[in-house]
């Protein structure tokens, strides 16, 4: 069997932690920021962990990370 290819778009958007969880960044941070509060923009800078229902599908896209 050949190796599974890594989905390059997913590889740029997600990374794995040391414990095997998948990290992601928040959306809504690139433009139209004037209507968002300072607190909202600050919280959007923080990373987030992928939810359990999505973990299996994303893990298939990035098998070697």
Swiss-Prot record:
Return the Pfam families for the record.
Ribosomal_L35p
Kindly give the Gene3D superfamilies that the UniProt entry links to this protein. Answer: 4.10.410.60
Molecular function GO terms recorded = structural constituent of ribosome
Gene Ontology CC: cytosolic large ribosomal subunit
Which InterPro entries does this chain map to? Ribosomal_bL35, Ribosomal_bL35-like, Ribosomal_bL35_CS, Ribosomal_bL35_sf
Question: What's an example Gene Ontology biological process for this entry?
Answer: translation
Compositional bias annotation for Basic residues: 1-26
What is the top-level taxon of the source organism? Bacteria
Q: Which UniProt keywords apply?
A: Ribonucleoprotein, Ribosomal protein
What are the boundaries of the region Disordered? Answer: 1-41
Q: Which PANTHER family match?
A: 54S RIBOSOMAL PROTEIN BL35M, LARGE RIBOSOMAL SUBUNIT PROTEIN BL35M
**Belongs to which family?**
Belongs to the bacterial ribosomal protein bL35 family.
Supply the name of the protein: Large ribosomal subunit protein bL35
Organism expressing this protein natively: Geotalea daltonii (strain DSM 22248 / JCM 15807 / FRC-32)
């Amino acid at each position: 069997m050949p190796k599974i290819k890594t989905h390059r778009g997913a590889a740029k958007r997600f990374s794995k932690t040391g414990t095997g969880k998948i990290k992601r960044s928040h959306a809504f941070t690139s433009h139209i920021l004037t209507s968002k509060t300072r607190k909202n923009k600050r919280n959007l800078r923080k990373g987030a962990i992928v939810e359990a229902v999505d973990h299996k599908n994303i893990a298939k896209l990035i098998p070697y990370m």
